């Protein structure tokens, strides 16, 4: 059994002497990606948001052009993009035509975080806490219906489920009933059932928010959140159980600081100690990593977009989410290539790291394809 001493020792070792992060990735895939143009490697890691809620929205023009040129690998839909069924499905069709294999990502947890709502004609998904009270047998067909509807609407990535532990005093999750339980075994069982329903439709599920956001005090949408005093290793347990159950193929890290896990004070999103040292080396995760939105206050208030994007890639993230709505930049995808190029020259990022990210995205897509 892994002890706290073992884990902390591994984190220190990871920071002092970074090891290869490509365990389990095919050597031929890594070699192939390492020879691809940098623009293609970077573009595939980017999932950008936009302004607009209809297919003819000006913000959709730049997204369509970026998709068609391979400058981005996917599109993030937020609440302001999903106001009507006709609008959101029309946008999804437009983007899918531009890039058939692109990730179209949206939050469809249920409860207060359900972008395709009942008012728009989709099935209402109760909040996780309410679902848990009704039991798995009642929830399973609801998850299956929600997954079919999401696919029919044009999406292939759900930024859910929540694998955090319930704590009523939590500002971002607990007070809204977004977590299934305070028990790690129950949380893992519920998340596995949720994932099964969506993956059966070929939809990727981003399990969030590693290493656990449930007992935090503060909301990283608004600003800096330090979990050093509140976090325990129990909060990482649901993520570990999902790995052992074979359900963890895409995971989202949190914009949280834990000085016990990273004494440098880097948020998890930018911390190699946590994403590589804890998650991959200690816990054995071999799936893909996706950031939470880098435009959230916890990141935006402390780092430039260049620092956040290149730092997130260097830390071990394979997909980068940027809503691009707080300060919209139609040239963000092009700038990202320049930023990564500068990081490569500076030695803070490597082509090998980009190749690893692309190889993991290959594996994620292959997992979701019908047998």
Label each region the model flagged.
Residues 83-95, 189-342, 348-349:
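Second-shell residues forming the walls of enzyme active-site clefts
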Residues 84-88, 133-145, 188:
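Glycine-rich anion/phosphate-binding loops
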């Amino acid at each position: 059994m892994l002890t706290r001493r073992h884990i902390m020792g591994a984190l220190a070792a990871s920071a002092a002497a970074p090891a290869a992060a490509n365990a389990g990735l095919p050597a031929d895939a890594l070699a192939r990606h390492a020879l691809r143009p940098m623009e293609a490697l970077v573009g595939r890691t980017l999932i950008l948001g936009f302004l607009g809620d209809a297919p003819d929205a000006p913000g959709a023009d730049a997204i369509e052009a970026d998709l068609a040129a391979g400058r981005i690998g996917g599109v993030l839909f937020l609440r302001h993009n999903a106001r009507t069924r006709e609008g959101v499905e029309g946008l999804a069709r437009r983007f899918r035509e531009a890039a058939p294999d692109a990730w179209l990502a949206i939050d469809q947890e249920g409860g207060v975080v359900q972008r395709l709502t009942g008012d728009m004609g989709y099935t209402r998904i109760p909040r996780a806490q309410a679902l848990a009270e009704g039991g798995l047998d009642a929830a399973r067909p609801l998850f299956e219906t929600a997954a079919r509807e999401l696919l029919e609407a044009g999406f292939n990535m759900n930024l859910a489920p929540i694998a955090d532990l319930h704590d009523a005093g939590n500002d971002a999750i607990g007070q809204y009933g977004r977590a299934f339980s305070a028990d790690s075994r129950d949380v893992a069982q519920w998340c596995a059932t949720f994932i099964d329903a969506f993956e059966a439709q070929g939809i990727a599920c981003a399990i969030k928010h590693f290493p656990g956001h449930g007992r935090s005090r503060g909301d990283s949408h608004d600003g800096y959140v330090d979990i050093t005093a509140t976090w325990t290793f129990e909060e990482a347990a649901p993520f570990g159980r999902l790995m052992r159950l074979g359900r963890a193929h895409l995971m989202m890290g949190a914009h949280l600081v834990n000085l016990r896990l990273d004494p440098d004070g880097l948020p998890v999103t930018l911390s190699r100690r946590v994403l590589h040292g804890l998650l991959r080396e200690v816990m054995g995760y071999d799936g893909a990593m996706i950031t939470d939105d880098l435009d959230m206050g916890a990141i935006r208030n402390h780092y430039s977009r260049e620092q956040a994007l290149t730092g997130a890639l260097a830390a071990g993230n394979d997909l980068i989410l940027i809503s691009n709505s707080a300060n919209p930049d139609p040239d963000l995808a092009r700038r990202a290539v320049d930023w990564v190029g500068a990081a490569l020259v500076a030695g803070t990022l490597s082509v090998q790291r980009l190749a690893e990210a692309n190889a993991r995205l290959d594996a994620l897509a292959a997992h979701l394809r019908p047998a």
